[in-house]
Amino acid sequence: MIILIAGDTHTGKTILAQKLLEKYKYPYLSIDHLKMGLIRSGQCKLSADSNDMELTNYLWPIVREMIKTCIENSQNMIIEGCYIPFDWEKDFTNEYMKQIQYICLIFSQEYIKHNFQNILKYCLLYTSPSPRDS
């Protein structure tokens, strides 16, 4: 079984992946860790500041083939990140799809309305200052 966890930044993907790892003992891959490993090693010309579409276009083919390899070898894996394309399903046959569970985490308007200050507080904790703030 492959568990794909997608969603925008700060929606809880990593926390959910960690909880699923603890519960099911499945290996866990953060696409962000893969991204930074490739960037820091000089294996790609992208940077941490590259736009999400460029990063998705580069990372998804790698992740997609890792998923297929896991399924072909009857291995479980939790994969989380924001670099999963919206049309990811087109890359898999029905046989592969039977082995993939997809979860997309979002904030509902109601949640945002009632928790806006907390969302803002935590987003600001993890956001680098812009050059204008210097």
Could you say what each language-model-derived stretch is?
Residues 55-97:
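Glycine-rich phosphate-binding loop used to anchor ATP phosphates in small-molecule kinases
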Residues 126-134:
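Single conserved hydrophobic/aromatic residue that forms the stacking wall/gate
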Residues 5:
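Hydrophobic anchor at the beta1->P-loop junction of P-loop NTPases
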Residues 8:
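P-loop (Walker A) phosphate-binding loop of NTP-binding proteins
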Residues 18, 22-58:
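Conserved substrate/cofactor phosphate-moiety recognition/catalytic segment
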Residues 98-118:
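Conserved phosphate-donor/acceptor-positioning beta-strand/loop module used by diverse small-molecule
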Residues 14:
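Walker A/P-loop
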Residues 11:
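ATP-binding Walker
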